[in-house]
Amino acid sequence: MWKLLPAAGPAGGEPYRLLTGVEYVVGRKNCAILIENDQSISRNHAVLTANFSVTNLSQTDEIPVLTLKDNSKYGTFVNEEKMQNGFSRTLKSGDGITFGVFGSKFRIEYEPLVACSSCLDVSGKTALNQAILQLGGFTVNNWTEECTHLVMVSVKVTIKTICALICGRPIVKPEYFTEFLKAVESKKQPPQIESFYPPLDEPSIGSKNVDLSGRQERKQIFKGKTFIFLNAKQHKKLSSAVVFGGGEARLITEENEEEHNFFLAPGTCVVDTGITNSQTLIPDCQKKWIQSIMDMLQRQGLRPIPEAEIGLAVIFMTTKNYCDPQGHPSTGLKTTTPGPSLSQGVSVDEKLMPSAPVNTTTYVADTESEQADTWDLSERPKEIKVSKMEQKFRMLSQDAPTVKESCKTSSNNNSMVSNTLAKMRIPNYQLSPTKLPSINKSKDRASQQQQTNSIRNYFQPSTKKRERDEENQEMSSCKSARIETSCSLLEQTQPATPSLWKNKEQHLSENEPVDTNSDNNLFTDTDLKSIVKNSASKSHAAEKLRSNKKREMDDVAIEDEVLEQLFKDTKPELEIDVKVQKQEEDVNVRKRPRMDIETNDTFSDEAVPESSKISQENEIGKKRELKEDSLWSAKEISNNDKLQDDSEMLPKKLLLTEFRSLVIKNSTSRNPSGINDDYGQLKNFKKFKKVTYPGAGKLPHIIGGSDLIAHHARKNTELEEWLRQEMEVQNQHAKEESLADDLFRYNPYLKRRR
């Protein structure tokens, strides 16, 4: 801002502040700069104008250009040098100007005005820029040593606030410059800056009495201290505040790493990077290096300095409670603050050890990631021995819902067979963290837990279908648990199980460690396919029979649903093509499809027990019954087909009935002889025709359109004039006749009053 200060002579009084874009006339009457007691001053002696010569108003090294134009009679002198009349000259700060010859001397000075705004909205910045521009100043976004004011609506602990306090610059509201501009335009005293201090809005400080005025103590607040920054972003943000406060700021990285004694030197403050904060993006290698430095400081009884302590040390003008590595951390601090603000949150977080990451998702082998009810806070081994898996599977089978004692042994054998089958096909297990029911709980609670676990594990939403190898593939514990549970539930739904299945189970349970490459395997793939076919057909038949009866208990219904889903899941995994054959039984009509049961089982020449022979005979009897039923159903189907073929034939001779209206018709409207009644052997032929109605052949004659002519009521002026004249003539004759009658009327019989 340019100012014209009176130095000596008649021109005394207050200085004149010059706004940009305004012409100030110097004279003795009716002008902006008035010099009265000098006879050598002309009425329009000279003109002062201040304007910006650059378009970029953010360049603080450029100031408005002040020009002086002489229009006087006795002359104007700049630094005792007379100007030419009618010419302009550029003035500099400190130049002396003399108007006239009687010693009216002035001095030109430029007062810098560079305002830095913080936490202002768009409208506030626009109004501030306009006011500062008229006052001849600049507005900048980043704090520098040239800044003279910090403009804020409310004081928050930011980097700009810290730098302004250290440099001793005032913090004012935006309204200060608006009022200042009004005072200059009205030639009044500028407003008091103390009345425009913004309020303190910082939760970490609270209602403490804080002096935010320019204090000399803050200029050397960090003298003798060296702040070590381990992050380049922090160094760029906070180094200027440390340097303004008389301290030294250094950036230490892995490339230029110093010795450990450097970090332990007195007066050295290591700034906390806040690696525990999830918002800071730091590479893992750099995190390890930073963590090693933090551990070294802890071993020596030192602590890192949070970012917020730098700002609080400047505000309270002390480094005893703040920025002291050997002192205790003060309450109400936060280790790091995102962005330029140092006060966007207030919480105590001084622990340097990174907390264990909380994984809210657990990954099950060969499945998609899903939400789990528990947190996985520790690493678990990926491979576990087969013996441990067997124990867990047996525990699951023991905790299953209670069945009759006769079925318990078969369910245990089924679990053994499923385990050995998993061993033959899958050499390695991948254990995933799943929920196991407790053994010590009651049986009812265990059954509910297993049902809920089976539903959660088996009815999972999957977005992808993965291709699986036929031979070399890994099976998770969930899949093996599915096989075991399916076999156990099969035993529950099958009261009469073939003894061949039990014999094979017992034989395999005795010889569990079976090699996949051995040629003497008793449990081959063909056996597995045939057995699972029989079990699947029987299980589905049992389910259909249950659906016809009344609903039993809720637990049995849940088991049936789980069993049905298990068979759907085990089909692609074990590569077994189960052909489900449905059997429907009704009271009146029995219809069964043809069933071809072929068992190509190859067994060894070992002795078969009597129980197995009896079961084989029962199966042969069942096959015969099924064949007879299939023949009976085939006969019924053939008879039904014949009836359907006969019913498809339509009647040939029909009586055609027509409904006629009682209206006289033209002879040409309808020709009944033209109707063809002989349609041959056509099926579904339309043997009717729409009945005509009167007027169907042609449109009725409607009066309209061109038949109608619009009637326009035109006035005949000649006829009207003639009629008017005739009326006037008749009226005139009537008047004349009435006058004549009055003259010659004589009434001899007068009525006299008595």
UniProtKB/Swiss-Prot annotation:
Disease annotated for this entry = Nijmegen breakage syndrome: A disorder characterized by chromosomal instability, radiation sensitivity, microcephaly, growth retardation, immunodeficiency and predisposition to cancer, particularly to lymphoid malignancies. Breast cancer: A common malignancy originating from breast epithelial tissue. Breast neoplasms can be distinguished by their histologic pattern. Invasive ductal carcinoma is by far the most common type. Breast cancer is etiologically and genetically heterogeneous. Important genetic factors have been indicated by familial occurrence and bilateral involvement. Mutations at more than one locus can be involved in different families or even in the same case.
Record region (Disordered): 326-346, 396-415, 430-478
Q: Which organism is it from?
A: Homo sapiens (Human)
What is the stated purpose of this protein?
A: Component of the MRN complex, which plays a central role in double-strand break (DSB) repair, DNA recombination, maintenance of telomere integrity and meiosis. The MRN complex is involved in the repair of DNA double-strand breaks (DSBs) via homologous recombination (HR), an error-free mechanism which primarily occurs during S and G2 phases. The complex (1) mediates the end resection of damaged DNA, which generates proper single-stranded DNA, a key initial steps in HR, and is (2) required for the recruitment of other repair factors and efficient activation of ATM and ATR upon DNA damage.
In residue numbers, the region (Mediates interaction with SP100) covers 111-328
| Induction field | Up-regulated by ionizing radiation (IR).
Q: Which GO terms describe its cellular component?
A: BRCA1-C complex; chromosomal region; chromosome, telomeric region; cytosol; Golgi apparatus; Mre11 complex; nuclear inclusion body; nucleolus
Lineage per the UniProt record: Eukaryota, Metazoa, Chordata, Craniata, Vertebrata
What happens when you mutate K665R? Does not affect ubiquitination by PELI1
Q: What's the protein called, per UniProt?
A: Nibrin
The record gives the effect of mutating V270P as: Abolished recruitment to DNA damage sites
Q: Where is the composition biased (Polar residues)?
A: 328-346, 430-440, 447-462
User: Would you say which domain of life the source belongs to?
Assistant: Eukaryota
Q: Quote the InterPro entries the UniProt record gives.
A: BRCT_dom (IPR001357), BRCT_dom_sf (IPR036420), FHA_dom (IPR000253), Nibrin-rel (IPR040227), Nibrin_BRCT2 (IPR032429), Nibrin_BRCT2_sf (IPR043014), Nibrin_C (IPR013908), Nibrin_met (IPR016592)
Q: What is known of its domains?
A: The FHA and BRCT domains specifically recognize and bind phosphorylated proteins.
**Cross-link Glycyl lysine isopeptide (Lys-Gly) (interchain with G-Cter in SUMO2): residue positions:** K529, K571, K582
Per UniProt, what does mutating K160M do? Answer: Decreased ability to recognize and bind phosphorylated proteins, such as MDC1. In RRHK mutant; abolished ability to recognize and bind phosphorylated proteins, such as RBBP8
State the oligomer form and interacting partners.
Answer: Component of the MRN complex composed of two heterodimers RAD50 and MRE11 associated with a single NBN. The MRN complexes dimerize on DNA to form joined MRN-MRN oligomers required for DNA double-strand break repair. As part of the MRN complex, interacts with MCM9; the interaction recruits the complex to DNA repair sites. Component of the BASC complex, at least composed of BRCA1, MSH2, MSH6, MLH1, ATM, BLM, RAD50, MRE11 and NBN. Interacts with histone H2AX; this requires phosphorylation of H2AX on 'Ser-139' and promotes NBN recruitment to DNA damage sites.
The effect annotated for S93L is:
In some childhood acute lymphoblastic leukemia patients; uncertain significance; rare variant
Q: Where is this cross-link: Glycyl lysine isopeptide (Lys-Gly) (interchain with G-Cter in ubiquitin)?
A: K435, K686, K690, K735
Which organs or tissues contain this protein?
Answer: Ubiquitous. Expressed at high levels in testis.
Q: Residue positions of the PTM Phosphothreonine? A: T337, T402
Domain BRCT as annotated: residue spans:
105-181, 224-315
Gene behind this protein: NBN
Effect ascribed to mutating K751R: Does not affect ubiquitination by the SCF(SKP2) complex
